[in-house]
């Protein structure tokens, strides 16, 4: 052991993988552009606590987390709403982002991970077709393996040679541009504490207004970048509907881009493995990926431990790719197709889904294990619910076309993911990933 591993970027999954490896005597260093005190956005996040257990971490102190509130989804016309009812055992935990980072960095340092903060990774070092290290502003650092945890716009992934078959850029509807802030709370909320507005104000956007003990949490998200003027206009309209949303911003106010797409088609190359947002491991419907990244960290560590010749090649790392897709990716990828269909909906389309009960509380009940198309299929197996959905869909020809196209595309995605090569062969993998990526193309 003792091989040198670099984690490029301080993503959650990368730090978790670093901890597991350092614990087994690997020499692991995380290179992160931010200062230690700036790790984590100034807001809260929700995730499945089982992700912590997957990579050997304990629960944080009780005062550092709480269970999330059920969400109420409001139709574009605001004439109908659906409230989810997540069973208590499926409730995700909600934590401050900075507290999440405190928890995992402390764990990683205890395991022996070294951190280089305020050190931005600029590009990979390539030796032929192998990733052999990273370049920063001031130095070139070599390693036996580079774990890419540098996020959605990773400079490592974006600068890999095309011959590796690893997608560099995102496509239309792959990313969500988000503004999030916390404002003073100006009224007590007795009813729906977590209000999610779908296609709010007739625009292709999602907004939420969530009651907290000390403030009101606001999110505005679109597939296109937001301007300050658009945010202020939307906030004004949200305040007209929500008495608890004040005008004094207490925290947050950042603009962030998050991935809401299928997982990266190829996760590995010689000397390289992608994880977390670098590999688009979020749930496409909601953009949450912390737990998936933690679970992937365990899978990656297992693949590295199994490489007794310490080659860290695409061939030996392919077991990580296979395990990730078997346990997570095969279920996440079809959800990206559902997201693409919803992205094509007009406000009238979505209102129709509410009105005809094509969407119901079960569909919107997203719990800790809702990270697979199979979760939604199981919910639809209720005969009465399925009959209601079928009648509603078949009664509207344009809706029928969209649903049929979605089902056809989901079937194609499931067939392609099942056909993933069992062993790594660059030519076979490149042919496969072209078919995989093609499943998600939009005009």
Residue positions per predicted region:
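Beta1/beta-strand and adjacent pyrophosphate-binding region of the FAD-binding site
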Residues: 1-11
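FAD/FMN-dependent oxidoreductases across multiple families
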Residues: 121, 226-304, 308-322, 326-330, ...
């Amino acid at each position: 052991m003792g091989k040198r591993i670099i984690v490029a970027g301080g993503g959650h999954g990368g730090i978790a993988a670093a901890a597991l490896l350092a614990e087994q005597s690997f020499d692991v260093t995380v290179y992160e552009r931010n200062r230690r005190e700036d790790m984590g956005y100034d807001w809260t996040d929700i995730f499945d606590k089982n992700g912590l257990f997957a990579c050997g971490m304990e629960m944080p102190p009780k005062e550092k987390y709480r269970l999330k509130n059920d969400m109420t989804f409001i139709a574009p016309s605001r004439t109908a709403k659906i409230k989810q009812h997540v069973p208590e055992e499926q409730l995700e935990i909600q934590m401050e982002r900075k507290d999440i980072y405190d928890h995992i960095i402390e764990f990683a340092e205890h395991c022996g991970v070294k951190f280089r903060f305020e050190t931005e990774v600029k590009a990979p070092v390539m030796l032929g077709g192998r990733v052999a290290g990273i370049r920063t502003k001031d130095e070139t650092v070599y390693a036996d393996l580079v774990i890419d945890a540098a996020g959605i716009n990773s400079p490592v992934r974006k600068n890999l040679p095309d011959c590796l078959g690893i997608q560099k850029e995102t496509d239309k509807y792959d990313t969500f541009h988000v503004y999030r802030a916390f404002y003073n709370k100006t009224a007590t909320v007795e009813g729906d504490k977590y209000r999610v507005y779908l296609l709010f104000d007739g625009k292709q956007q999602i907004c939420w207004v969530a009651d907290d003990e000390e403030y009101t949490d606001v999110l505005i998200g679109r597939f296109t970048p937001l301007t300050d003027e658009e945010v202020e206009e939307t906030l004004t309209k949200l305040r007209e509907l929500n008495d608890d949303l004040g005008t004094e911003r207490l925290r947050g106010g950042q603009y962030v881009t998050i991935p809401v797409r299928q997982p990266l088609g190829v996760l590995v190359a010689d000397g390289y493995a992608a994880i977390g947002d670098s590999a688009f491991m979020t749930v496409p419907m909601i953009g949450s990926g912390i737990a998936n990244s933690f679970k992937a960290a365990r899978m990656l560590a297992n693949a590295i431990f199994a490489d007794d010749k310490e080659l860290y090649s695409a061939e030996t790392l392919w077991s990580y790719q296979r395990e990730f897709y078997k346990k997570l990716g095969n279920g996440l990828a079809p959800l990206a197709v559902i997201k693409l269909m919803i992205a094509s909906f007009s406000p009238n389309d979505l209102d129709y889904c509410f009105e005809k009960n094509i969407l119901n509380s079960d569909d919107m009940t997203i719990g800790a294990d809702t990270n697979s198309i199979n979760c939604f299929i199981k919910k639809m197996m209720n005969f009465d619910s399925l009959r209601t959905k079928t009648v509603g869909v078949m009664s509207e020809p344009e809706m029928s076309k969209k649903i049929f196209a979605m089902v056809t595309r989901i079937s194609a995605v499931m067939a392609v993911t099942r056909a993933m090569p069992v062993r790594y062969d660059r030519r076979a993998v490149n042919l496969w990933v072209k078919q995989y990526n093609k499943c998600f193309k939009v005009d």
